[in-house]
Amino acid sequence: MGDARLDENAHVPVYTVNKDAVTYAKRLIDTRQYVLRSRWQDVQPRAREQNAFLKTHSWEEYAAWHLGLTEGADEETKARYAFVYGDFRRLHRLGLIACHYRAAEWRHKAIELAAHELLQYLDRKIAS
């Protein structure tokens, strides 16, 4: 009998934190470019909104809205960017919560912590 164990996350992509996106999210918070209450499922950018944004913005600007970078994915492809937290105009508190939840669900600890820290940062700014 071998010691082979089934890795339940074997086919789950690996992500690193997009530090530029964290910096951009903090800038949005500092300049009050956020929505505290929204229906994230209604405002989360879908393919149509993503494509429209990319027609008039750079990949660098697109990347700034995503907390995760997919390891191994080609640069300047949508597959490279994950964990969107805003609607390409404003940060959404529920977008950060969705990032936190999804990262925790799939055990992407660095993304989970980045989303959590941004939530705390936002909540401190609101309270002050």
Please describe what each predicted stretch is.
Residues 2-128:
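A charge-rich, low-complexity, intrinsically flexible signal that marks solvent-exposed coils, linkers
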